[in-house]
Amino acid sequence: FLIFLGGILVMFIYVSSLSANEKFAVDLTSFMWVVPTIVLSFLVLNKNFMFMSPSS
């Protein structure tokens, strides 16, 4: 999961450096879609990981 977030960060920096002369603004609607998606995916991955781990 951390590798995925690192890749997203690298792509964001790369795209923002390509369009350095233009204003790069994140609108609120896309932000409102991205944050819950990341949180839900983290919860789903965490729940699957808890079910796969052996209980002792």
UniProtKB/Swiss-Prot annotation:
Q: Which UniProt keywords apply?
A: Electron transport, Membrane, Mitochondrion, NAD, Respiratory chain, Translocase, Transmembrane, Transmembrane helix, Transport, Ubiquinone
Location of this chain's protein in the cell: Mitochondrion membrane
- Membrane topology field: Multi-pass membrane protein
Recorded GO molecular functions are: NADH dehydrogenase (ubiquinone) activity
Catalytic activity, reaction form: a ubiquinone + NADH + 5 H(+)(in) = a ubiquinol + NAD(+) + 4 H(+)(out)
User: What does the protein in this record do?
Assistant: Core subunit of the mitochondrial membrane respiratory chain NADH dehydrogenase (Complex I) that is believed to belong to the minimal assembly required for catalysis. Complex I functions in the transfer of electrons from NADH to the respiratory chain. The immediate electron acceptor for the enzyme is believed to be ubiquinone.
Family stated for the protein in its record:
Belongs to the complex I subunit 6 family.
Q: What is this protein called?
A: NADH-ubiquinone oxidoreductase chain 6
State the organism named in the record: Artemia salina
Q: Which gene encodes it?
A: ND6
